[in-house]
């Protein structure tokens, strides 16, 4: 029997000016998505702010749910989903993320791509991604098509529609670890 692995998708809405603008145009409850390689959310990756106070200085980031941008916005709402994957898919996802990590300084946020996606026009620019484009591409390159769309057209809510996701938490992100510990102790 093949061993199953789990990866986690963290969907969030920080309430920042940028996330409120996205929410205004999309009317979606979640405006950001990240990949977590562990259930404790210690290894979380996405495209977002490199500096919590400057939304325009953005690129590939390892996020910390209790520091940095998320701590600046303590009322960040979130939904955390678990996705079971094969060992081969898990290793591929890790390799994809390692590819981004090894050249992390080259990557910047795809502001133009997020605008063109709203007109159903994907744009590929080397070393430039927005959060859901990054997540969709990492999974697609690992044999998992989360949205059925081109990564450059994928929104966080498109990813949420993937049928194999299992909700493990919904609420304020700042409360996740405490809620997660209670479940782990009770289980």
Segments (PLM) and residue ranges:
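Cysteine-nucleophile amide-bond enzymes
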Residues: 1-187
